Design a protein with these regions (language model features):
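Patatin-like phospholipase
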Residues: 1-42, 50-279
Length: 279
């Protein structure tokens, strides 16, 4: 079984609907009462990490699979009714407030730390947020962390425009080390050896034209992500970190809606966690 001490961190990558893999991992951790003194999540990793921190086993799976099938909160339907491809009003207000209540009390009473990552649209840099008591601000932060560029409107935290933290820090391993945690368990949503295209990502001239540093960050996104993957694999080989990831390329897209594919990926996450942690 995994040996956790006061210097051990849990790092959660995002990946949109690929995050159901992480849901499986976190449910395994909760089933075995495995807790970390510090965790950090990006985008879907932030969403699922919140349910882990409030000890709500199964909440991530229910939100990402069962309620997706019922409410169809991704795709053309929310695009027509709202301002993006994802119904954020449903996800970040109706779900935690009424449909799938979030246990803010349990989260506030959890002595362990949890940070969420966003991208500052003005500076083009990562922001790291730690909030346990202001319920409105918690939602603002996790919503911003999960606001995919192009697919969602900008979100605001303390009046500052923010987008998905994965733009600049998809795998915040170095952040965990900077915070003093030199033992990390990293949960990825891509298989070993995966790399994005090395070409710079073109950003249409009419998009985010008032945010030049954000545009630079978007163009360099693939390069930064590949560098983070290389660091993860190098440190894994050196025995510095433990990595839980899909064993083979997955067929689930960032905005996947297939219940079967999502359920299979959730189960894969649970089994991968069991295999890695139990050896």
């Amino acid at each position: 079984m995994l040996n956790i001490d006061e210097k051990t961190a849990l790092v959660l990558e995002g990946g949109g609907m690929r995050g159901v893999f992480t849901c499986g991992v976190l449910d395994y951790l909760m089933d075995h009462k495995i807790r970390f003194p510090y965790a950090i999540g990006v985008s879907a990793g932030a969403c699922n990490g919140l349910s882990y921190m409030s000890h709500q086993r199964g909440r991530g799976k229910f939100s990402n699979i069962d309620l997706l099938a019922k409410y169809k909160y991704i795709g053309i339907r929310p695009l027509v009714k709202k301002r993006g491809l994802i119904d954020q009003q449903l996800l970040f207000h109706r779900f935690p407030d009424r449909i799938l209540p979030y246990n803010y009390k349990a989260y506030a009473e959890n002595p362990n730390r949890f940070e969420m990552v966003t991208t500052d649209c003005i500076t083009g840099r990562a922001c790291y947020w730690e909030e346990k008591h202001d319920e409105k601000r918690i939602i603002e932060i996790v919503k911003a962390s999960s606001s995919l560029p192009y697919a969602c409107p900008m979100s605001y935290v303390d009046g500052h425009p923010m987008l998905d933290g994965g733009i600049v820090d998809s795998i915040p391993l170095l952040r965990a080390y900077e915070q003093g945690y030199d033992k990390c368990v990293v949960v990825l949503t891509r298989n070993k050896g995966y790399r994005k295209s090395t070409k710079k990502v073109p950003v249409p001239s009419f998009i985010y034209k008032q945010y030049p540093r954000l545009r630079v960050a978007l163009r360099n996104r693939n390069k930064i992500y590949n560098e983070q993957l290389e660091l993860v694999e190098r440190w894994e080989e050196e025995g510095k970190i433990i990595v839980i990831r899909p064993e083979k390329p997955i067929v689930v897209g960032r905005m996947e809606t297939s219940v079967k594919k999502l359920t299979d990926l959730y189960n894969q996450g649970y089994e991968c966690a069991k295999k890695v942690i139990e050896g």
